[in-house]
């Protein structure tokens, strides 16, 4: 067995420490230089000793107690193994039932570190939920709010991750069961107390928000609307000659992009996010086409005979002839734009009118189970109306003309609603004829419009929770 000795493997310690040829030997990190050569082990075993420290049986020479044991770092795992009398076996091997007893994160299916916020969860999801409930929760899903949340993709979409946290039962008052030694009755009582305190806190916070909203001046409210304005969206202009498919493809792509920005715009309106989620979504579902159209009119107000869909998509009436049934809608849009031009619509007036369209859009009863949200909505409508009256008064025209101007602006909203219904019917027709595919948020908005038309009564809250694009 001479060929297995450390001398053959250059692990021997040179006697002459001044010799330059032995420098590399002294720098070796192999701990075998400190022990006598186990003649019955192969060179491969000597080079794999770090893994064998946990894999060999206790009878292995590597597990014998030696004077140089303190050279190894003493860690918590090392002490645990020594206490269990198995210094060379892995924790899993020493406890065959550990895998069976392991818990998994209810959100991402990773190994759970404990019982956090009412469910078993990992450290990552626990920290994410903690950040979210402390105020950092203005997340928007860039897709269809159906992203897969697992160990590898949990960071890809914060909105869907937070939605899943709530779906699996995470809550602010969740107790850590593994650290709780109380009886079940006491745990329930503590939970009820916590929920009661949370309810009182939420009610107090709501009153504070209402007071703050009522004290906001019309000027401050209009400035907030100005800051909430979404950016211009670009879309590639279809190449000529225009076809029905290419034109509709450009328009639907533009609408889908604008819908994403519309959600962010609505959430920035003071008081909107204080409404119930049910009411927020119903309002947006009811007015999205109107908001898109009045934005189109505002962009086109200084361009007679043109419709400025986007900075890089400018169309006139004749260019719409390639799409069946769209000329009637183009004529309505051009006529309303001309009327706004005659009234010399100001930018701040446009901001207030657009917010009014959103807040006054639902023709169905809002959440019957949350009358508080309905009351907030009416209060918010009064705030927007006051802001519009203030903007008109700031123009300097006489009081009688101010009343007339307010009436003229409000009367145009019914025409915007009529054009919106025509546009919705046309888009549904194009979709049913397979002229253009409709995806993502635009598709869900269309489906919601169709379902609402087929229903005689508004949706119930549990059913509606399936529509989750606006979950934060």
From Swiss-Prot:
Gene source species: Gallus gallus (Chicken)
Residue ranges occupied by any NR LBD domain in the UniProt entry: 217-449
Descriptive protein name: Estrogen receptor beta
Domain of life, per lineage: Eukaryota
Family of the protein in this entry: Belongs to the nuclear hormone receptor family. NR3 subfamily.
Lineage: Eukaryota, Metazoa, Chordata, Craniata, Vertebrata
Subunit structure comment from the entry: Binds DNA as a homodimer. Can form a heterodimer with ER-alpha.
Gene name of this polypeptide: ESR2
UniProt cross-references to InterPro entries, sorted A to Z: ER-beta-like_N, ER-beta/gamma, Est_rcpt/est-rel_rcp, NHR-like_dom_sf, Nucl_hrmn_rcpt_lig-bd, Nuclear_hormone_rcpt_NR3, Nuclear_hrmn_rcpt, Znf_hrmn_rcpt
Annotated region described as Modulating, given as residue ranges: 1-104
